[in-house]
């Protein structure tokens, strides 16, 4: 084990990284309420793992989407557990995110010099809600279909460009295969990629500036 460690140490100086992480100052006022951000991240990682597992069996077509979900729940080994964990962690992620936002706001974590940290956090909150909106429709059952129809119809109220926005979201004038394809692509590719980018920025700024002090 020592030779293995020494090999990496000689090339990457990993001990410096470990020392930097372990030596980071943690303010004495930090308590359990400061864990909500980390719990949100944990839920996100569960989402990534379980979501990735389901992509092997889910079929993003209007004809097969619902039956593929049934197949996951009834035929795939531990499929019911994987999908249930995905749903439960999604709800928990939203709850932890809300509590995290309240904690940051009440302790003044958005104030100078942490404005950019707050902005990236707000963007991550929007992305989290977007995950919920797109994922809710993927089973393509009655609830998912009508939720998709209502959500994509909201921009219609925007003056001038409303109809164009709706058509872009739906992939046409009505809700159908193009809409499901767009939601699936957003849910599994675009939103996760953006989330990882803004999470890295969020954590790097926290690492640089540290945790905000007490009120």
UniProtKB/Swiss-Prot annotation:
Ligand binding (heme b 2): 86, 187
CDD domains, alphabetized: Cytochrome_b_N (cd00284)
GO cellular component: chloroplast thylakoid membrane
Domain of life where this protein originates: Eukaryota
Keywords, ordered alphabetically: Chloroplast, Electron transport, Heme, Iron, Membrane, Metal-binding, Photosynthesis, Plastid, Thylakoid, Transmembrane, Transmembrane helix, Transport
Residues that hold heme b 1 according to the record: 100, 202
Topology in membrane: Multi-pass membrane protein
InterPro entries named in the record: Cyt_b/b6_N, Cyt_B6_PetB, Cytb/b6-like_sf, Cytochrome_b_N_euk/bac, Di-haem_cyt_TM
Cofactor: record remark: Binds 2 heme b groups non-covalently with two histidine residues as axial ligands. Binds one heme group covalently by a single cysteine link with no axial amino acid ligand. This heme was named heme ci.
GO biological process, alphabetically ordered: photosynthesis; respiratory electron transport chain
Transmembrane segments: 32-52, 90-110, 116-136, 186-206
GO-annotated molecular function: electron transporter, transferring electrons within cytochrome b6/f complex of photosystem II activity; metal ion binding; oxidoreductase activity
Anything else known: Heme 1 (or BH or b566) is high-potential and absorbs at about 566 nm, and heme 2 (or BL or b562) is low-potential and absorbs at about 562 nm.
Family, similarity comment: Belongs to the cytochrome b family. PetB subfamily.
Chain's role: Component of the cytochrome b6-f complex, which mediates electron transfer between photosystem II (PSII) and photosystem I (PSI), cyclic electron flow around PSI, and state transitions.
Protein name (database record): Cytochrome b6
Species in which this protein is naturally found: Cyanidium caldarium
Taxonomic placement: Eukaryota, Rhodophyta, Bangiophyceae, Cyanidiales, Cyanidiaceae
């Amino acid at each position: 084990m020592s030779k293995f460690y020494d090999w990496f140490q000689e090339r990457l100086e990993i001990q410096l990284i470990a020392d930097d992480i372990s030596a980071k100052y943690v303010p004495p006022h930090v308590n359990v309420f400061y864990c909500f951000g980390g719990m949100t991240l944990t839920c996100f990682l569960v989402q990534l793992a379980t979501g990735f597992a389901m992509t092997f069996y889910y079929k993003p077509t209007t004809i097969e989407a619902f039956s593929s979900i049934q197949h996951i729940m009834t035929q795939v080994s531990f499929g019911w557990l994987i999908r249930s964990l995905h749903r439960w962690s999604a709800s928990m992620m939203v709850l932890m995110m809300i509590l995290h936002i309240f904690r940051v706001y009440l302790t003044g974590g958005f104030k100078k010099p942490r404005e950019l940290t707050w902005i990236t956090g707000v963007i991550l909150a929007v992305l989290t809600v977007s995950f919920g909106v797109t994922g809710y429709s993927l089973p393509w059952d009655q609830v998912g279909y009508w939720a998709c129809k209502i959500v994509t119809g909201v921009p219609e109220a925007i003056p001038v460009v409303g109809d164009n926005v709706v058509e872009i979201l739906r992939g046409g004038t009505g809700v159908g295969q193009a809409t499901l394809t767009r939601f699936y692509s957003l849910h599994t590719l675009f939103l996760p990629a953006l989330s990882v980018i803004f999470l890295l920025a969020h954590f790097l700024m926290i690492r640089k500036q540290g945790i905000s002090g007490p009120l």
